[in-house]
C-alpha cells in the first residue's frame, strides 16, 4: 500500500506504510540505542519518534516492545550468483535479518564467461551441483556486458538488495578462454592485459563495487574439459594483478582476494599494492581472506591482528581481513570437503565423480601409501585443516556402531594409522554414506571474542549459498549478537551491542561502498526486529532443508524463527517470525520485489526515493 495523506476538516493525518512501535533502536553507526517508534513511508524511514505515532490507516504495525530494531545485516561474502536466478528471494539469508548480499566473491562471477565456463568455474569450488548451476545460467543468461548483467539481476523479484564484484577468474576466462586461462605456460599478451583492464573498467562504470580474486590454488574446476585444474586467477602474475588493481585505484573501488597460503610473501604484496605511500598517495581498500583462530595454527591469532595494523600504518595500506564470528564447524559426506584439496591424493579422489571408481581408488594400497606420505608431511605455513582424526566425529553411517566415534578412536581400537581407519570406514560403508563433523577454527571463546573486537578485521566469510552440505552460517549476525549479549550479562563484555550491530551493518557499508547499513531518518528502510530473549541455543542448532530447485538436495540451514520477529527490505516487511512462525510475504521472491541492485556510489536514501 502506498502512503497517502487525508485532510479531515483542517487537520492533516500522516499515514505510514509500516510502523515499528517502541523498539530499542540501533541506527547502525555505533551510537547508543534509544527506545523509539519508527514510521516508514515510500520505502524510507520518515519518522523516528520518542512518542507514539498515529497508526490510523497504517496496514502494518510491528510491536517491537522489548525487541531490538536494527539495520538489516549486510553479508559481504556470499556465493548466491546462480541461486539468485532460481530463488531471487534468497530466503535462507533474509529470514535471519540479512537485507543486503554481495555476489561475485573469490574470483567467481557470472558476468562475462559463457554458461558452461561459469558452471565449471563455480560448481566444484563452491560445492553446488553443476547441473543446476549450468541450468540456471543457460535458462537465464541474457546478458553479455556488466550493464546488462546488472539490469538482469535488478529485473528479478529480488528479496534482499544485491551488490556484486567482478571475478578475476570470470574476467580471465572471457579474455583468454578457459583452457589458456588455466595453463601455467601461458602469459597474456599486452593486448590481452589491456582488454582485461578495459572490461574491468566497464564493470566498475556500470556500478560494480570492485574486483575479487583468489591466489590460493586449492580450488579446482568442475566439468569434463579441464576438470581439477586450479582457478584461472591463481595463474595470474603480479604484473597482471597490478594492472587490474591500478584500474580499481583510479576508480576508488575495492579488491576482495585471498593470499597464496604456500607463499608467505603473497600477503605482503597485497599490502604493498594497497599502499598510498607507494602509489601516488591513492590507496586501494582490500578485503582479504581470512582471519580465524585456526586449530592448525594456534599461535597465529596472537599476532595476526597486530601485524595487520602495523603493516597498514607503516605502508599506508587499507587492508582488512574477513572474520566469521562463530566456531567454524564443518560437515562432510565422505571426502566431499574442500580441505582435502590440500592434498594431491585428495584432489585425485575428488576428481572422480563415480562412487564405485572413487571407492576403488580409496581402497588401493599404492594410493593409500601416497596419501599417507602427504598426510604425515609437516606443512609449513597456513593450513585449512588440523589433520587430527581424533577431532573428526561420525554423525551418520550405515554401521550404527560407529556413530559418535572419532576416526582417531577407531584407529586406536584397530591399531591402524588414522588415515587408514578413515579410508577403511569410507570404503566399508560407501564413501558418501559416512557423514562426519569437525571444528577447524574459532573454537576458543576468548580468542573468538578478541577477533570480533579486532579493528583490522571486518565481519564476513559466511559463504552463504555455497558448500550446501558442509556448512551453514547464514545467521552469523545473530550468533555474534548472542555472544555479545551473553558476555555482557556475565560481566565480561568484549563488544557492546551497538558496536556489534555497527560491525554487521554500517561498518561494512562504509568499507565496501554500499548504500546500506544505517537506519536513520531519511535512510532506506532495510531493517530487522530481533527478540533478544530468543538469542538462545536455537541460533546454534543443526538443521537441514530440502531445496526444490536443487533437485531436493538437503542443504544445511539455520532455523531460529522465534529470534527474528520481522525483516524488512525497502520499507516492506517480507518475513515475520516470532508468533508468525517464520512466514514470508505472499508472492515473495516470485512476483513481489522488495530488493534492488545497489550500484557503487549510490546512497541508501537516494535509492529509496528513485525506486
From Swiss-Prot:
InterPro entries, per the entry: Amidohydro_3 (IPR013108), Metal-dep_hydrolase_composite (IPR011059), Metal_Hydrolase (IPR032466), Metallo-dep_Hydrolases_sf (IPR050378)
A GO cellular component entry from the record: cytosol
Keyword annotations of the record: Hydrolase
Single GO molecular function: hydrolase activity, acting on carbon-nitrogen (but not peptide) bonds, in cyclic amides
Database matches in Pfam families: Amidohydro_3
Superkingdom per UniProt: Bacteria
Coiled coil: none
Family label: Belongs to the metallo-dependent hydrolases superfamily. N-acyl-D-amino-acid deacylase family.
Name of the featured protein: Uncharacterized protein Mb2937c
Biological source species: Mycobacterium bovis (strain ATCC BAA-935 / AF2122/97)
Amino acid at each position: 500500500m502506498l502512503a497517502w495523506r487525508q485532510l479531515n476538516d483542517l487537520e492533516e493525518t500522516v499515514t505510514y506504510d509500516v510502523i515499528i512501535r517502541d523498539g530499542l533502536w540501533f541506527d547502525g553507526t555505533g551510537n547508543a540505542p534509544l527506545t523509539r517508534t519508527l514510521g516508514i513511508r515510500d520505502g524510507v524511514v520518515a519518522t523516528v519518534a520518542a512518542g507514539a505515532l498515529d497508526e490510523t490507516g497504517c496496514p502494518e504495525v510491528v510491536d517491537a516492545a522489548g525487541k531490538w530494531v536494527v539495520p538489516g545485516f549486510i553479508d559481504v561474502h556470499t556465493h548466491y550468483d546462480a541461486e539468485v536466478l532460481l530463488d531471487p528471494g534468497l530466503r535462507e539469508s533474509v529470514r535471519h535479518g540479512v537485507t543486503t548480499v554481495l555476489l561475485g566473491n573469490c574470483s567467481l562471477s557470472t558476468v562475462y564467461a559463457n554458461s558452461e565456463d561459469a558452471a565449471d568455474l563455480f560448481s566444484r569450488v563452491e560445492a553446488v551441483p553443476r547441473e543446476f548451476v549450468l541450468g540456471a545460467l543457460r535458462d537465464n543468461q541474457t546478458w553479455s556486458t556488466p550493464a546488462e548483467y546488472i539490469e538482469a539481476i535488478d529485473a528479478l523479484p529480488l528479496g534482499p538488495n544485491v551488490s556484486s564484484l567482478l571475478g578475476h577468474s570470470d574476467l580471465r576466462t572471457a579474455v583468454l578462454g578457459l583452457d589458456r586461462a588455466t595453463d601455467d605456460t601461458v602469459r597474456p599478451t599486452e593486448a590481452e592485459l589491456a582488454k582485461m583492464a578495459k572490461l574491468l573498467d566497464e564493470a566498475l562504470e556500470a556500478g560494480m563495487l570492485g574486483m575479487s580474486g583468489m591466489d590460493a590454488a586449492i580450488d579446482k574446476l568442475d566439468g569434463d574439459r579441464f576438470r581439477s585444474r586450479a582457478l584461472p586467477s591463481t595463474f595470474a602474475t603480479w604484473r597482471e594483478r597490478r594492472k587490474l588493481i591500478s584500474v580499481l585505484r583510479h576508480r576508488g573501488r575495492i579488491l576482495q582476494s585471498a593470499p597464496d597460503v604456500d607463499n608467505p610473501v603473497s600477503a605482503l604484496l597485497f599490502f604493498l599494492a594497497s599502499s598510498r605511500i607507494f602509489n601516488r598517495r591513492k590507496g586501494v581498500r582490500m578485503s582479504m581472506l581470512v582471519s580465524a583462530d585456526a586449530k592448525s595454527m594456534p599461535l597465529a591469532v596472537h599476532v595476526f591482528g597486530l601485524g595487520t595494523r602495523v603493516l597498514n600504518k607503516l605502508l599506508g595500506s587499507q587492508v582488512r581481513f574477513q572474520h566469521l564470528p562463530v566456531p567454524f564447524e564443518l560437515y562432510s559426506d565422505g571426502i566431499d570437503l574442500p580441505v582435502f584439496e590440500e592434498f594431491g591424493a585428495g584432489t585425485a579422489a575428488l576428481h572422480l565423480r563415480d562412487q564405485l571408481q572413487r571407492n576403488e581408488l580409496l581402497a588401493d594400497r599404492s594410493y593409500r601409501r601416497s596419501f599417507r606420505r602427504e598426510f604425515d608431511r609437516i606443512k609449513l605455513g597456513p593450513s585449512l585443516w588440523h589433520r587430527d582424526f581424533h577431532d573428526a566425529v561420525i554423525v551418520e553411517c550405515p554401521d550404527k556402531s560407529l556413530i559418535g566415534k572419532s576416526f582417531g578412536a577407531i584407529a586406536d581400537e584397530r591399531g591402524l594409522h588414522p588415515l587408514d581407519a578413515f579410508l577403511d570406514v569410507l570404503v566399508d560403508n560407501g564413501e558418501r554414506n559416512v557423514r562426519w563433523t569437525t571444528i577447524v577454527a574459532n573454537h576458543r571463546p576468548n580468542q573468538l571474542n578478541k577477533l570480533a573486537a579486532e579493528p583490522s578485521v571486518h565481519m564476513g566469510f559466511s559463504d552463504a549459498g555455497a558448500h550446501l552440505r558442509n556448512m551453514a552460517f547464514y545467521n552469523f549476525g545473530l550468533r555474534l549478537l548472542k555472544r555479545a549479549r551473553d558476555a555482557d550479562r556475565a560481566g565480561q563484555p568484549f563488544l557492546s551491542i551497538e558496536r556489534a550491530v555497527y560491525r554487521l551493518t554500517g561498518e561494512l557499508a562504509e568499507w565496501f561502498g554500499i548504500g546500506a547499513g544505517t537506519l536513520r531518518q531519511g535512510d532506506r528502510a532495510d531493517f530487522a526486529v530481533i527478540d533478544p530473549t530468543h538469542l538462545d541455543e536455537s541460533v546454534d542448532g543443526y538443521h537441514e532443508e530440502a531445496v526444490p530447485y536443487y533437485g531436493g538436495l538437503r542443504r544445511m540451514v539455520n532455523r531460529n524463527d522465534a529470534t527474528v520477529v520481522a525483516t524488512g527490505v525497502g520499507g516492506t516487511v517480507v518475513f515475520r517470525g516470532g508468533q508468525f512462525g517464520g512466514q514470508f510475504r505472499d508472492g515473495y521472491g516470485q512476483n513481489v520485489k522488495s530488493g534492488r541492485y545497489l550500484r557503487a556510489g549510490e546512497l541508501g536514501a537516494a535509492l529509496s526515493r528513485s525506486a
